[in-house]
Design a protein with these regions (language model features):
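Hydrophobic HxD+1 residue recognition
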Residues: 19
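Surface-exposed alpha-helical segments enriched in charged/polar residues
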Residues: 2, 76, 80, 128-131, ...
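An alpha-helical support segment within catalytic cores of ATP-dependent transferases
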Residues: 1-16
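Active-site activation/catalytic loop segments of kinase-like enzymes and analogous catalytic loops
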Residues: 46-87, 102-119
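Regulatory N- and C-terminal appendages and interdomain linkers associated
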Residues: 111-149
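Acidic, serine/threonine- and proline-rich low-complexity regulatory regions
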Residues: 38, 63, 85-97
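Catalytic activation segment of kinase domains across protein kinase-like and atypical kinase folds
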Residues: 22-58
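A cross-family kinase active-site recognition segment
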Residues: 11-12, 39-42, 124
Length: 149
């Protein structure tokens, strides 16, 4: 399995642990601040990457037309920016480790205890994403498109 092989790699990073848009702030000078890093520790970059990236999918699902015009370009730009910053090899390694983290994040946002106003259709799509992630050897960035087909 790609996840097991990737875990043997040399790259362990400091993680935030709850990296999502509502924990990222910018001030008037565009300085970045991260909130709520209490669950941060050392781990896989794939954890924080999927925690942030899943929001492009999650916020597009209730208004599916926004995927093609807004969120898909942002999704692609996010991953491309990471590739440019870290290199293709690290991106591939992190995508190989991403499935369990993506599945976990999908389960979190599908959970009515944390997101009670999410529609059944959105919950179902997030659960589908979780199942597909767990069935995969790595995160296929293009597979997300199927949720909007």
């Amino acid at each position: 399995m790609a996840v097991a092989a990737a875990c043997r790699g040399p790259r362990i990073v400091r993680t935030h642990g709850d990296f999502h848009p509502f924990n990222i702030l910018f001030d008037e000078q565009d300085e970045l601040a991260l909130l709520d890093a209490s669950r941060g520790c050392k781990g896989a970059a794939a954890d924080d990457l999927t925690a942030l990236a899943i929001n492009y999918v999650f916020f597009a699902l209730p208004r599916r037309a926004t995927w093609r015009t807004a969120f898909a370009p942002l999704w692609k730009a996010f991953w491309e920016s990471y590739r440019l910053a870290r290199g293709a090899e690290e991106l591939e390694r992190d995508l190989g480790m991403a499935p369990p983290f993506m599945a976990w994040r999908a389960l979190v946002v599908a959970n009515p205890a944390w997101y009670p106003d999410v529609t059944l259709e959105t919950r179902d799509a997030m659960l589908t994403l979780a199942e597909r992630a767990l069935d995969a050897d790595g995160l296929d960035l293009d597979e997300v498109e199927e949720l909007f087909a």
